[in-house]
A protein has these predicted regions:
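Short, conserved phosphate-binding/catalytic loop or strand-edge motifs used
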Residues: 236-240
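Extracellular/periplasmic, surface-exposed regions of secreted and cell-surface proteins
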Residues: 106, 112-121, 126-131, 139-235, ...
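Surface-exposed, extracytoplasmic segments of Gram-negative outer-membrane nutrient-acquisition systems
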Residues: 41-53, 61, 426-434, 472-497, ...
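A generic structural motif
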Residues: 94-96, 349-351, 511-513, 597, ...
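Residues embedded in well-ordered regular secondary structure
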Residues: 1-100, 138-141, 185-192, 200-207, ...
Length: 776
């Protein structure tokens, strides 16, 4: 049994005969006598238990995870009067996660009201307050699942304490010096998020018809605010891997966004054929962000995980303010409920861009024709038909930050930790920030072209909608790498052009609609293809996130985004090159996967039979790829199903492989011939240790078909003003995917990496529940 974490060790059936730990043979641990049929477990000895165990298989994942439970409760009160109304709601959601010490508590309150002060004057408001506390555990390399997934099945995490006897701060784990034991992490590490948020608005509206029925003017002023504070507390307890003496971080954001909106809305029924609408408006958005952070390392003594116990301490504060002023207008003209023309324009002035590029204008125009309003085209089959087209521009400001100085932190080149932090002996240090901003930075611009049709057949029996759109994006704002000689690592600049082709189709069918039986279906199809056309001069691709390898990148000519990493070595015919044992060789760093799917198709149905209502939602994603770090690590450590199968097989091989022969051909190139052998079970460990360095080996097709939700509801009581409904539901109960055991939509990293990577993710879950709704 090898505690280094880098050897598979013997099979369960051979543990008792292991030359180092086996109880059937003479070794260091059997000097006092043999322990037939058993083997010595150092971790049991360290925990003060009987060190001898009978070999057997354990299910560490089953022992570690628990059944998550969520409770949701809400109450809503609403009432209407002759000249007003109000509503009040209160809700609470409490959940326990599938990992102990994780969960959420959330409370929300909403109050709204509206009153007619006069024939021409109306006022109203709505306010929402939400407070939540979320308890989490780490993911990826810091994840609690890392040891759960990589511990050999002969080792019981549940049966062996996670710390040595008498010392709760020294871990007792099979994979020491790499990652925290999952149970130890749940007991000693914590990641807490506390949030409070208020958002709402109030308005005053004046309406007049000028004494006629053909004109109407609404003048409305609305002021709103969205303010929230989120505080995070990250604790790595004394004895954690990487931060041996502990780590504490307290950081938080306070965001306040005020919105002032003034609109003038005018409606004019010119005559029986023409209707004119106009909208003029002004919007002011003022956003303030305050960010504070305090970090402490190396606790003076264990047992008190607090910043005040840190021997190395650092803190920082950041404040940002952004203001946007927008003026906009919209003009619409309708003719005979048949032709609709709309023209809009908006000009924004932002404070977050360089002074010369703060103002930008973006217009739009759209035209729609309801051709079934033409008398000659009216019929009982196609009861509604509309063709539409539009052109629009959208401007999006970036964030320009003048050069500034910051206090650096220097790592020691090892996993986790920042051992050198200022102040040092009371002295601070400041250096220029490593990202610089182009002083000519300008807003990103998107031009969109759209064509579509909306069709309804047989008075709503069938509905069909299709939309094609093309988006051309220019002046994208990217962080472009710079040469080290510049004194900076990268520059934020306008560095790209992209285009997107989008196809969307919705189909609705309602074949049955009777008093006691209703049936309807709906399909939603979407195909979105994004391509990178240009980047900054001299830049072929940009890293969006990831590791040294693999990475998520945006590359010229590639579908956005792509997975970039070490691929298989291939010959001129595209065959994977293997050695004489059938073990593949590493090739060049290249594009090894495309993240975006070919298409998505959603399907939902509702069936009402008497008072029962059954609903189902399916989702099909076709295409797209994901890198699975979990698969790579569990194969490497020999704990995956595949590694067990290869270990037992006589000939595991690639269907399309080649092996290099001695010598070269007439052109001086290597000679490759088809490989017909395979990896022997005895070489399985060598095989998986080799392919660990080939990222392409763990890029999987990310297609899936999900039964997202199945629900059944029934009104059990209805009398006078009292209605009682009950419902049951199941979510994610069926998933077909090449990636087994995990949710194919699991993802880690920033938004640019969404759907591209997973590493030590939590297992996929299904949920079952019931609900009771009472209305009176």
């Amino acid at each position: 049994m090898d505690n280094s974490g880098f050897s598979w060790g013997p099979s369960i059936s051979d543990l008792a005969n292991d030359p180092v730990y086996g109880g059937n043979v003479q070794n260091e641990y059997t000097k006092g006598g043999l322990h037939n049929g058993q083997y010595y477990v150092p971790q049991r000895a360290a925990a003060g238990l009987d060190p001898w165990a009978t070999p057997q298989a354990y299910n560490n994942a089953k022992d570690f995870f628990q059944t998550g439970v969520t409770w949701s409760n809400s109450v809503n009160v609403a009432q209407s009067f002759d000249k007003g109304n109000y509503s009040f709601s209160l809700g609470n959601t409490t959940s326990d996660g599938i990992v102990r010490s994780t969960g959420m508590d959330r409370y929300n309150v909403k109050l709204s009201g509206e009153a007619q002060l006069h024939d021409n004057w109306t006022t109203g408001f709505n306010g929402n307050f939400v407070t939540s506390k979320i308890k989490k555990q780490g993911t990826a390399n810091d994840g609690v699942t890392a040891t759960v997934y990589t511990a050999p099945i002969s080792y019981t995490m549940a049966g062996i304490p996670s710390h040595i006897e008498g010392d709760p701060y020294t871990q007792n784990t099979f994979r020491e010096n790499w990652i925290d034991d999952g149970n130890w992490a749940c007991d000693n590490n914590s990641f807490t998020e506390r949030s409070q948020r208020f958002f709402g608005n109030a308005f005053l509206k004046y309406s007049t018809k000028f004494g006629t029925d053909n004109h109407k003017l609404d003048v409305k002023y609305q002021i709103g605010d969205d303010a929230y504070t989120t505080n995070y507390s990250d604790i790595y307890g004394y004895g954690t891997t990487g931060y041996t003496n502990g780590y504490a971080s307290e950081y938080g954001f306070t965001v306040n966004e005020m919105n002032s909106l003034l609109t003038f809305t005018y409606n004019w029924n010119i005559n029986e054929d023409f209707v004119f609408d106009a909208l003029l408006g002004n919007e002011l958005v003022d956003k303030r962000i305050s960010n504070t952070q305090a970090v402490g390392y190396s606790f003076n003594f264990p047992g008190w995980n607090h910043l005040n116990n840190a021997s190395v301490f650092n803190s920082s504060h950041e404040y940002k303010r952004k203001r946007t002023v927008g003026n906009f207008a919209s003009l619409s003209l309708a003719w005979k409920n048949m032709l609709y023309l709309n023209v809009t324009g908006r000009n924004d002035i932002v404070s977050s861009m360089p002074r010369d590029n703060r103002s930008f204008f973006y217009p739009s125009v759209s035209l729609g024709w309801v051709f079934t309003e033409v008398e000659a085209l009216k019929n009982d089959i196609l009861t509604f038909g509309k063709i539409r087209g539009s052109y629009a521009e959208v401007g999006m400001a970036g964030e320009y930050v003048p050069s500034y100085y910051y206090t650096p932190g220097y790592g020691g080149g090892f996993f986790q930790g920042t051992p050198i932090m200022y102040p040092i002996n009371g002295n601070m240090a400041y250096i220029p920030y490593f990202v610089v901003y182009d002083p000519n930075l300008k807003p990103q611009n998107t031009k969109s072209y759209e064509l579509g049709a909306d069709l309804t057949f047989l008075n709503g029996l069938v509905s069909l909608n299709y939309t094609y759109s093309r988006q051309n994006v220019k002046d994208q704002i990217f962080e472009v790498p710079l040469a080290g000689s510049t004194g900076a690592s990268s520059m934020m600049m306008n560095g790209g052009k992209m285009h997107s082709n989008v196809h969307e189709i919705t189909l609705g069918i309602s074949p049955v609609d009777t008093k006691n039986f209703k049936l309807d279906f709906a399909f939603n199809f979407s195909k979105i293809d994004n391509y990178v056309d240009e980047l900054a001069p001299g830049v072929e691709s940009i890293m969006l996130g990831g590791f040294v390898t693999p990475q998520v990148r945006a590359g010229i000519g590639d579908k956005f985004p792509v997975i970039y990493g070490v691929g298989y070595k291939r010959d001129g015919e595209g065959r994977i090159v293997v050695n004489e044992k059938g073990i593949p060789e590493a090739g060049e760093t290249q594009v090894i996967g495309k993240v975006s799917p070919d298409f998505r198709l959603g399907f939902n149905t509702n069936i009402e039979l008497y008072k029962f209502r059954l609903a189902a939602v399916f989702d099909w994603k076709q295409g797209g790829q994901m890198y699975s770090g979990t698969a790579g690590e569990t194969n490497f450590y020999g704990t995956s199903k595949l590694s067990g199968e290869v270990r037992k097989s006589d000939k595991y091989h690639f269907d399309y492989a080649a092996v290099e022969q001695k010598g070269v051909d007439a052109d001086g190139k290597p000679i490759y011939v088809p490989y017909t052998g395979g990896v022997k079970g005895s070489d399985a460990e060598e095989y998986f240790k080799s392919v660990r360095g080939i990222d392409e080996a763990y890029v999987y097709d990310n297609s899936f078909l999900k039964l997202r939700e199945l629900s059944l509801s029934y009104p059990v009581y209805k009398k006078d003003n009292l209605n009682v409904n009950v419902n049951v539901f199941a979510r994610n109960i069926i998933v077909w995917s090449e990636i087994k055991g995990f949710d194919p939509e699991a993802t880690q990293g920033n938004n640019n990496m969404a759907g591209a990577f997973e590493r030590f993710s939590l297992p996929g879950t299904s949920s079952y529940g019931f609900g009771v709704n009472v209305n009176f």
